[in-house]
């Protein structure tokens, strides 16, 4: 009986503080310091991928100018540099969803390598070996390049 009176009195105080309407978790969050900034709504957009382009959120630091590699860490063209450095448009993609989609950015990357190094695929395979670190992905791309060479396209 005493417990009911205490909890009933507590509800009355809260209802008087928040107003006469029903209580919800959103009402409680509005009263938190910061105005409920943790529970902001996130806008969901349809996914869209392009070869060589990462998705960058507005206001994110990932797309800010000057956040790339420092010039001192860039690889030089000297003997310690890679044998076949890819041009900027041939950098390996970083935005693969790994779902096995038919228009995979890695397959587009293999096609771009073949078009750039038009020597029958030898330099494309060498660049692939040098710039792709995942062994499973290398095997998949090797097979794709070899199939395209055999089919003549």
Swiss-Prot record:
Residues 84-118 form the Oxidoreductase-like domain. Transmembrane segments: none annotated. Residues 55-87 are annotated as: Disordered. InterPro entries: Oxidoreductase-like_N, OXLD1. It comes from the Eukaryota. PANTHER family: OXIDOREDUCTASE-LIKE DOMAIN-CONTAINING PROTEIN 1. This is Oxidoreductase-like domain-containing protein 1. The gene is OXLD1.
């Amino acid at each position: 009986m005493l417990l009911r009176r205490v909890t009933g009195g507590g509800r009355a105080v809260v209802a008087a503080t928040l107003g006469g309407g029903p209580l919800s978790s959103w009402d409680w969050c509005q009263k938190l310091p910061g105005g409920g900034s943790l529970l902001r709504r996130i806008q969901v957009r349809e996914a869209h991928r392009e070869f060589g382009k990462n998705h960058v959120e507005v206001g994110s630091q990932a797309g800010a100018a000057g956040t790339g590699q420092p010039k001192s860490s860039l690889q030089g063209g000297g003997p310690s540099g890679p044998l076949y450095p890819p041009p900027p448009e041939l950098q390996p993609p970083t935005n693969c969803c790994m779902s096995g989609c038919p228009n995979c950015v890695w397959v587009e990357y293999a096609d771009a390598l073949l078009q750039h190094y038009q020597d029958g695929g030898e330099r494309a395979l060498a660049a692939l070996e040098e710039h792709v670190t995942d062994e499973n992905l290398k095997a998949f791309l090797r097979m794709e390049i070899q199939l395209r060479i055999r089919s003549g396209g």
